[in-house]
């Protein structure tokens, strides 16, 4: 099925989505329906955050839990966007000193937003919770499969993972492979074999799971 043909779910956001953003939400919904994650790699400025919030607004039930990881410079931006587009959602930024973060985690908010650095320190606490969705903003942070954060995320149990990246990840196969190990473990061959594949084979492997639009194509 092509995302364009997939029905747009009922969105509960205070925003009018552009056509390409609706396609992004359909694509996420389609992957989710079939039990897959994916990488939303639109150019910066095309509203990856809004598309994510719109998708979540269509999926959230009372018992659904979401974890969003982002660089610390972006976590409050996420909070602002939720307040603007989906003020009904129970959202909290998990940030500050360790006791403060522990208390916030224990409060059990439906959507938790934290930095990669804080997550690394709090991974034990998060592992005790059941998350339905994990979103990795600026996912190229995991470009090195050897980093501690990548290791923690590969072992982190969650039903559905999406990565967001504003850089053309297909330009760096090693980076792409590392992100796929977290988003869709087992889909790609070993790193050694993957790096030897011709470009068209790589494109065929990843095409259904990567959505990338350029500014000049959609604006």
Show where each model-derived region lies:
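ASCE P-loop NTPase motor core, strongest for the SF2 helicase catalytic module
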Residues: 1-219
